UniProtKB/Swiss-Prot annotation:
Keyword Kinase: yes
Subunit structure of this chain's protein: Homodimer.
Family: Belongs to the ROK (NagC/XylR) family. NanK subfamily.
Binding site for Zn(2+): 156, 166, 168, 173
GO MF annotations in UniProt: ATP binding; N-acylmannosamine kinase activity; zinc ion binding
Catalytic activity of the protein: an N-acyl-D-mannosamine + ATP = an N-acyl-D-mannosamine 6-phosphate + ADP + H(+)
Organism annotation: Pasteurella multocida (strain Pm70)
Pathways involved: Amino-sugar metabolism; N-acetylneuraminate degradation; D-fructose 6-phosphate from N-acetylneuraminate: step 2/5
Protein name, entry field: N-acetylmannosamine kinase
Record's keyword terms, sorted: ATP-binding, Carbohydrate metabolism, Kinase, Metal-binding, Nucleotide-binding, Transferase, Zinc
Binding site for ATP: 5-12, 132-139
Length: 297
């Protein structure tokens, strides 16, 4: 079956036909900013017209939370004019094919999981450590999405009850301690100020301040992994994102995890898929849902 896959981000929208895990006719345009809702309706109409007659179903990976086909977020301000955008309804105006939607990190989790030995790995988590911290959770070989689309927002679990206030409003979330934005909040106050990239360069040179800062982030992610293992019996975790893939970061996470009792351990690996993870993962997930007879809300 041929899939029209879309990956809707804050700055770009990618689209392609995905057939048997192969991407064809990939296009990329800027995400509308001015008059965002009306412009997004027009953009989606144009994309559907471009690929008309070439697909059997539509799969969408999007930033934010997909709640019953509507785009929202823990902090709706992050979506600007697209908060509460009726994403599924907008697409359905232009096609009668099945439509499946999930958030971009859930889609990336599917991209990382799709080639796993499903008999060996039934419980799997993808964690992205980037500007923020997010995740996708697969339990008993099925992506956890229901009922309100928030499953996988593991960056908003607790890391430090006395830590910084997170953008979601809670104190001490993992994201507020471990994410690139959290690293920058500290390193930007140094003399001279540093970006997260520069902080990592100093970390690799054994700078004391930078090492403590990166260790704080890696320790929070290691504890998050341990919580997932003990709470959900997770067998494998894959880590991606600009921070998660930074040189020296994942070995540090593993080091902290290995210091814990063995029943908190699991396999931890680096993400393999890059910019097209959203397209590939969304296409795989919707195809699997259709194969299993799962209703796409």
């Amino acid at each position: 079956m041929r899939c029209l896959a879309l990956d809707i981000g804050g700055t770009k929208i990618a689209s392609a036909i995905v057939t048997d895990g192969k991407i064809e006719q990939r296009q990329q345009i800027a995400t509308p900013q001015a008059d965002a809702a009306n412009a997004m309706h027009d953009t989606l109409a144009n994309i559907l017209a471009l690929y008309a007659g070439q697909f059997d179903y539509v799969a969408v990976a999007s930033t934010g939370i997909i709640n019953h086909g509507v785009l929202t977020a823990l902090n709706p301000k992050n979506l600007g004019g697209l908060a509460e955008f009726p994403l599924k309804e907008s697409i359905a105006r232009h096609t009668d094919k099945p439509i499946g939607l999930l958030n971009d990190v859930q889609a990336a989790a599917c991209a990382e999981y799709k080639d796993e030995d499903k008999n060996a790995v039934q419980n799997f988590v993808f964690i992205t450590v980037s500007t923020g911290v997010g995740g996708g959770i697969i339990l008993e070989r099925r992506l956890l999405t229901e009922p309100n689309g928030v499953a996988g927002h593991i960056g908003h679990t607790l890391a430090d009850p006395n830590g910084p206030v997170c953008g979601c409003g809670r104190v001490g979330c993992v994201e507020a301690v471990a994410a690139g934005r959290a690293i920058e909040a500290v390193s930007s106050q140094w003399n001279p100020p540093c970006t997260p990239k520069q902080a990592f360069e100093l970390f690799r040179k054994n700078d004391e301040k930078a090492t403590a800062l990166i260790q704080r982030s890696a320790s929070a992610i290691a504890n998050l992994i341990a919580d997932l293992v003990i709470g959900l019996d997770v067998q494998k975790v894959v880590v991606g994102g600009s921070v998660g893939l930074a040189e020296g970061y994942l070995p540090l996470v593993k080091q902290y995890l290995n210091m814990m009792p063995h029943f908190y351990h699991c396999t931890v690996e680096q993400a393999r898929h890059g910019q097209d993870a959203g397209l590939l993962g969304a296409a795989w997930w919707v195809a699997d849902c259709l194969k299993q007879g799962v209703h796409l809300k």
